[in-house]
Amino acid sequence: FQLNVIANNNNHTMLTQTTIHCHGFFQGTNSADGHAFVNCCPIASGHSFLYDFSHPDQHGTFCYHSHLSTQYCCGLRGHFVVYDPSDPHCGLYDVDHDSTVITLSDWYHVAAKLGHSFCLGADSTLINGSGRSTGDCAASLTVISVTQGKRYRFHLVSLSCDPNHTFSIDGHDMSVIEVDSIASQHVTVDSIQIFAGQRYSFVLTANQSINNYWIRANPSFGNIGFHDGINSAILRY
């Protein structure tokens, strides 16, 4: 696996150096692990670094993020899915592709370098990059579309900086088949408590009436609840 990172950030309200840590890979290469000042130097602005490591025996859901101070909390984070051609659970679902990834993240209106808002909680919970803050009911929400009768493997990824989230989808159970990139015995639940850096795969059967259903990700503190669509997205048949 190779990831070339170029540091071009010139916004001095945030840290301009960076590192990248690929979370969950047992890659065994200190130089590519991305822990700033522990086993690597930060990438200086205007420079680049090639992360190069192997993970031939790992499959599942992973994430990456900055590992320099609080830069992660300002948005430098994302996900990976490594598909297993011999997935033991492949008979349990019909659909698994880039539209079946669900990311949860906390979003702060003040850059971490400028304020101390973290103790108060995030302004917004973002689901696949979209969400509302209190008093802003006009902001768009993520819509995830499904077809009635199909079974979907969703990859749920917590990119949270601080709070954990309780995740659920109105009217639907979830059959968990993977935890932190490890295939597991499937367990049916109606909600998942997911902490920073954790990943789950679950199978959702689209067996309800054609309608819209709330997807909910309630944070452990801060702007909790679902008034005006905060901490929410939409599952649409």
UniProtKB/Swiss-Prot annotation:
Cofactor field: Cu cation
Effect of pH on activity: Optimum pH is 6. Retains over 72 percent activity in the pH range 5 to 8. Retains activity above 89% after incubation at pH 6 for 72 hours. Retains activity above 61% after incubation at pH 5-8 for 72 hours.
Reactions catalysed according to its record: 4 hydroquinone + O2 = 4 benzosemiquinone + 2 H2O
GO BP term, pick one: lignin catabolic process
Summary of the protein's practical applications: Could be used in the treatment of dye effluents. Able to decolorize structurally multifarious synthetic dyes, including metal-complex dyes, in the absence of redox mediators. Shows the highest removal efficiency for metal-containing dye Acid Black 172, followed by Congo Red, Remazol Brilliant Blue R, Reactive Brilliant Blue X-BR, Indigo Blue, Neutral Red, Naphthol Green B, Methylene Blue, and Crystal Violet. Displays higher decolorization rates towards Acid Black 172 when immobilized on composite nanoparticles (Fe3O4@Chitosan).
Activity regulation annotation text: Activity is promoted by magnesium, Fe(2+), nickel, zinc and cadmium ions. Completely inhibited by IAA (cysteine protease inhibitor), PMSF (serine protease inhibitor) and DEP (histidine protease inhibitor). Inhibited by CTAB, SDS and EDTA. Inhibited by lithium, sodium, aluminum, potassium, calcium, manganese, Fe(3+), barium and mercury ions.
PROSITE patterns membership: MULTICOPPER_OXIDASE1
The protein's Enzyme Commission number: 1.10.3.2
Chief location bin: secreted
Record's subcellular location: Secreted
Details of cofactor binding: Binds 4 Cu cations per monomer.
GO molecular function, one term: hydroquinone:oxygen oxidoreductase activity
Annotated Cu cation 1 binding sites: 21
Keyword Nucleus attributed: no
One GO location term (cellular component): extracellular region
SS bonds (residue pairs): 73-161
PANTHER family cross-referenced by the UniProt entry: FI03373P-RELATED, MULTI-COPPER OXIDASE
Entry function: Lignin degradation and detoxification of lignin-derived products. Multicopper oxidase that catalyzes the oxidation of a variety of substrates, including phenolic and non-phenolic compounds. Has highest activity towards 2,2'-azino-bis(3-ethylbenzothiazoline-6-sulfonic acid) (ABTS), also active towards hydroquinone, phenol, gallic acid, catechol, guaiacol, levodopa, 2,6-dimethoxyphenol (2,6-DMP), tyrosine, ferulic acid and veratryl alcohol.
Official protein name in the record: Laccase
Source organism: Ganoderma australe
